[in-house]
Amino acid sequence: MALLPDKEKLLRNFLRCANWEEKYLYIIELGQRLPELRDEDRSSQNSIQGCQSQVWIVMRQNAQGIIKLQGDSDAAIVKGLIAVVFILYDQMTPQDIVNFDVRPWFEKMALTQHLTPSRSQGLEAMIRAIRAKAAALS
């Protein structure tokens, strides 16, 4: 995930944005930095239910036990939200993911207050799916 900032830099960059238009543009930019998802990974088993947009998230565990996440969406802002979630879970084991609460980070970013209800529900669906997949691996 060298193309994406770490958690602290994400928060700093987000807080530097002057208004919500800039913040949305930053979220979209983060989504554009995600590596391309292979066509074969755009399957029903990787599809996230509960999102209005199409969302696919792939979870793989490397030899050191660290989770590698890949994902995509057909909506630019949602793809950016996927990138934000991936940044928060970067370099974690399955157990780390299960134990890590992303909500304080979203509160620091004031993210959930500025998303539409359907996007907030989709974001929650992504987090639930990632945590469930991680729990199955831990």
Curated annotation (Swiss-Prot):
**Where is this protein localized, as stated in its record?**
Cytoplasm
* Record keywords: Cytoplasm
Pathway as given in its UniProt record: Cofactor biosynthesis; iron-sulfur cluster biosynthesis
Which is a Gene Ontology cellular component entry for this protein? Answer: cytoplasm
Name the InterPro entries on file.
Cysteine_desulfuration_SufE, Fe-S_metab-assoc_dom
Active site: residue positions: C51 (cysteine persulfide intermediate)
Highest rank taxon of the organism: Bacteria
Q: Does the keyword Cytoplasm apply?
A: yes
- Which Gene Ontology biological process is one annotated for this entry? iron-sulfur cluster assembly
Function field: Participates in cysteine desulfuration mediated by SufS. Cysteine desulfuration mobilizes sulfur from L-cysteine to yield L-alanine and constitutes an essential step in sulfur metabolism for biosynthesis of a variety of sulfur-containing biomolecules. Functions as a sulfur acceptor for SufS, by mediating the direct transfer of the sulfur atom from the S-sulfanylcysteine of SufS, an intermediate product of cysteine desulfuration process.
The family database entries (PANTHER family) matched by this protein are listed as: CYSTEINE DESULFURATION PROTEIN SUFE (PTHR43597:SF3), SULFUR ACCEPTOR PROTEIN CSDE (PTHR43597)
Subunit text: Homodimer. Interacts with SufS.
Q: Which family does it belong to?
A: Belongs to the SufE family.
Q: What is this protein called?
A: Cysteine desulfuration protein SufE
Q: Which organism is it from?
A: Escherichia coli O17:K52:H18 (strain UMN026 / ExPEC)
